[in-house]
From Swiss-Prot:
Family: Belongs to the alpha-carbonic anhydrase family.
Binding site for Zn(2+): 95, 97, 120
Activity regulation statement: Inhibited by coumarins, sulfonamide derivatives such as acetazolamide (AZA) and Foscarnet (phosphonoformate trisodium salt).
Tissue: Expressed in spleen, lung, kidney, heart, brain, skeletal muscle and testis.
Entry GO CC: cytosol; intracellular membrane-bounded organelle; myelin sheath
Molecular-function GO term, any one: carbonate dehydratase activity
Protein name in the entry: Carbonic anhydrase 13
Amino acid sequence: MARLSWGYGEHNGPIHWNELFPIADGDQQSPIEIKTKEVKYDSSLRPLSIKYDPASAKIISNSGHSFNVDFDDTEDKSVLRGGPLTGNYRLRQFHLHWGSADDHGSEHVVDGVRYAAELHVVHWNSDKYPSFVEAAHESDGLAVLGVFLQIGEHNPQLQKITDILDSIKEKGKQTRFTNFDPLCLLPSSWDYWTYPGSLTVPPLLESVTWIVLKQPISISSQQLARFRSLLCTAEGESAAFLLSNHRPPQPLKGRRVRASFY
């Protein structure tokens, strides 16, 4: 398997990632199954403080592994603070994970329940590190907000994204995408679970403070089908759809999951 060819297929999927990225078998890998009976409420966890500047959204691209919406992270325009975090974490990008059918697709699992999809909003510690790339190698470098998507009502907040997918259908395509506030994709309750973990895609670096929101948002079956119409192949290659892009839960290995709520 060539270094750049990891994916979600039979021959390059998550069970093969350790061949190129040995940390795949590390002690702080993500995602995990959250077992609510084993979670501890922690009264020291603060509420989340989130301020995003819609004008800092820049481009949407097809990485071949998902779509990414990238933000201008040259200054603290869009930041996540509070919760389990110390200092400011600057918004870098968000992307989505889904499955080949509506009954699975989320990366984190809660008491055996798999949601249809999972949004990841990625931030980096701009108080301590000069760039995302450097922060990604430090244990307190990244903070990822995870939001579950559950099949239900059509979600108008996703429309701007689904409407533009045709212009980034092939891997490597990108287009301008601005005036978007990811806050509109968060549920009304910001109750969360938190634990130390990793990126869920290679290079799988163990530098993430995970903040997984308990309350899901809705997505219709038709909207979710739009994401499966993206290709994991570039223009000129034999076309293959990105039907599924989620990593299964990894062993907890003694880590503690804390809750901000009873």
